[in-house]
Amino acid sequence: MDGGSAEALRALAAVAGALVVAVTMVVTARLAGRIPATIAGLAMATVGAAPFIESFTLSGELLASVFAVASLLAFVFYLERPAPGWLIAAGLLTGCAVLVKQSAFDAGAAAAVYLVWTRRRGGVAPAAALVAAAFVPVVIAAATAQSFHDWWYAMVTYRDQADSILTGSFHTRLHQARLSLPAAERGLGALALLALAGWRRWPLLGVLWLGFATLAVIGGGNFHNHYYQQMVPPLALLAGIGGAELLRRRKVAWAAVVAIALAATVFVTAPLWFDSPNAQARTIFPDDPHLQTDAQVVRYVRAHTRPGQHIFVMWAAADLYYLSGRDPSFRYMWFRNIQAIPGALGQARRMLAGKRPPALVVGINSPASMDPSGRTQRILDTRFRKVATVAGVPIYAPR
């Protein structure tokens, strides 16, 4: 392997983003008309694509949204013409969305609740059929997994034990939420204000969709900025309705508020267009300084390892594996995984001290940042030697 292409990832993100915008426009047109759909698409493709919530990245939220929004469109078709096929399609697409990102149940949950809410007992059977269809791809994935235990842990147990709003201290989760609010305000504020302009005309299905998307963001617990991407499609739908209402009723005062919010969004975003890539990375990813040195580190790794050899990036920066074309020597590639999964740190130590150590250890983070006991540092001191420092990043090779 010669390494992955960042340009390929960007192109795929652009295609996925365009698909989500297009399908959201169709959903909006079916629920509210062409003018709201046009406004929803424009809003989603501009302010909804805010860099502050990392909307330009090929995130799990973006990829899952392709399936989630498509599932809602299938459900809208079912409401227009109650053919069971559309209901089953909505369920299957919901299941696919959840397989991409466990939090991407929002559209499917909104559809199921909508059926019961509006049809009472008559909605129970179709809602059950939708939910049953959603489980089909999930069951297939579980049945075909190499290890059902590992699959179950990755899909269910990990979140339940280590990483959700229900784990950790309430104070810590509240602090993380507060830290994410500035990015959420800059990324979603204008959309939310535009949506509020037409709140009296919001369709129940759109309200439920936004509600479940918000619940999914909160449920993740860590409040990473990219979590908020999940709220963009339902907010865009409601923003399209709000924008159409402003045009219809000529609400000058509210239009002025929205205009100020849009201007503020442009004001804080436009400078990034003219910044260098490193400056952009510092602004958008302040907690990931390795992004500014990854290119140099990747060149070194490629030059000093062969395809087929394994490396270990300590403790995070999984992009280095992809960009260098070298496989990881350890199964967990994110800081939080090793920090939160019981026994993961011990497994990492055993891997480093084992008979087949990685060809290189890239010290993106210090050993003590994960292991203050000093045991990982002692393994590096006795089993490895520092062979280079690339852009401030120490690199070790086995002795």
Regions found by a protein language model. Give the residues of each.
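Transmembrane-helix motifs of polytopic, lipid-linked glycan transferases
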Residues: A11-I35, I39, T46, A70
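Specific aromatic-rich, kink-prone transmembrane helix
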Residues: V23, A64-R81, W86, L93-T94, ...
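Membrane-interface alpha helices of multi-pass inner-membrane proteins
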Residues: W86-Q102, G108-L115, A132-V138, L210-G219
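Short periplasmic/luminal acceptor-recognition loop of GT-C membrane glycosyltransferases, typified by
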Residues: F105-A109, D287-A340, G346-M370
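Perimembrane helix-loop-helix junctions
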Residues: A107-A133, L193-R200, L237, G243-R249
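Hydrophobic, aromatic-rich transmembrane alpha-helices
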Residues: L181-F212, A239
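Hydrophobic/aromatic-rich transmembrane helices and adjacent perimembrane loops
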Residues: G221-W254
